[in-house]
Amino acid sequence: MPTVAYQGHAGAFSDVAARALVPGAETRGYGSFDAAAAALDAGEADYAVLPVENAIAGPVPRNYELLWEHPALRIRGETTLPIELCLIGTAGASEATIREIRSHPVALEQVRRYAEAHDWQQTTTTDTAGAVREIVTQGYPTVAAIGPALAADIHGGTILARGIQDEAENYTRFFLIARTDEAGAGNRACVGIAVNDRPGSLRDALSAFADRDIDLRFLIARPDRRVPFRYRFFVELANVDDARLAAALAVIGGEQRILGRY
């Protein structure tokens, strides 16, 4: 049975994504994204699942950096998960009894209007499922968690309300990561590039893709910690094949790495 590492407690959205990407796998929660990636790199798991972009909150930059920092890791797939947030309490609780809600800061932001309408105190936690586990363990009828329905099922919470997120069209995209030397196959790719420090270098790099009919889907810049004020760019591409991708990267030059084909 394959094992999949993710950040959070059982029932977290990353756990939901892991179960969708690798059906039948054993999923293992870790305390941070860094710890999940390190576990995969060390051979403690066969895969890792990392969130990389939320439709409301935007990208998760750290998880692109982790792919660069762990050269043996490659993207092997992706999935997009609809995010339904639930108000989860203990047995006997109701919306009327709640005075405080707990969850990850991103989840709390995504239910901001709902929470403000009830004038609840808000407390941040490290992950959504961890908040559910915490309130069930403590058994406070006045405290609820914001999290996925799976977390309520696993930890014995009671769903008091469903679909409480402010935006109905709320999705998170996840990468499936494996430890392998092979870049992979597929018509999508993610690459990391550090362009030269000269005028027009980023424009020229992006043109190298466009000139070969490679579609740019996503671009994020992150500081290169080794060189002050130098940036590394993570680029997600579509309509990719081996020859055209290799030709584009040859034109771009500099420090670069294919982080995965999928």
Label each PLM-derived region with a short phrase.
Residues M1-Y262:
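Domain-level signature for soluble enzymes in the chorismate/prephenate branch of the shikimate pathway
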